[in-house]
Amino acid sequence: MEVNVERLKELRRERVLSLRELEGKSGVSYNTIWRLEDGRQGAHPRTLRKLAEALGVAPSELIRGGGDTDG
């Protein structure tokens, strides 16, 4: 799945989490998170679910074109 890179970074920064801290909260490896944020790879649905849960959002918010931001 194509990750909304900017949204992932924004959510992590809003929660004042480093990549290592997000790794600890989500169980997703540092390298995977780094590659996702850098746009170097897509994500499996399970990975998106883990990241979304750690960030307190719906998985759809992390998918390009998946988050409803129109109010």
In which residue ranges do the predicted regions lie?
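Residue-level signal for the short linker/turn that defines the boundary of a DNA-recognition helix
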Residues: 6, 16-17, 43-46
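Residues within the helices of the helix-turn-helix
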Residues: 9, 20, 49
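The alpha-helix within a helix-turn-helix
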Residues: 12, 23, 52
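Short C-terminal boundary/hinge segments that cap the last helix of small helical domains
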Residues: 56-71
